[in-house]
Amino acid sequence: MPAPGSEQDFVVNVGDRVYFDLDSYSVRPEAQPRLDAQAAWLARYPQVTVRIEGNADERGTREYNLALGARRAEAVRTYLIQRGVPAGRIDTISFGKERPIVEGSNESAWAQNRNAHTAIVSGAPR
């Protein structure tokens, strides 16, 4: 069982990743409960800072996917700020298509690689 307030607690009990539709950076309705849980967890542990990492699938140019990943990360950041997380606790970065979580050139892999990952930067034990 992960220790409360730990990075493992966040990953296992809250969830650190939400997914996006093809060529979209709109937060999907099914992602909202996870992001609401992230915001609540971050409110409970105010010393924690996070980085939202925007990702894209392999289709499209490197430049296009870096821009799309940035918009996805910013969409999640905005959502968390609207739920009360102070802006100063959230950084963003885009990895575009450079860091796939699933290898493959099929819809299943692409769907998983279109995501925003909330990574804990500081303030929580592993």
Question: What are these model-predicted stretches?
Answer:
Residues 108-112:
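A generic structural micro-feature
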Residues 30, 34-37, 63, 71, ...:
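Extracytoplasmic/secreted proteins, especially bacterial periplasmic and envelope-associated proteins
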Residues 102-106:
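Short beta-alpha junctions and helix-cap segments that line functional grooves
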Residues 24, 62, 107:
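Generic anion/oxyanion-binding catalytic loop in active/binding sites
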Residues 46-55, 70-101, 114-126:
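A non-catalytic structural micro-motif
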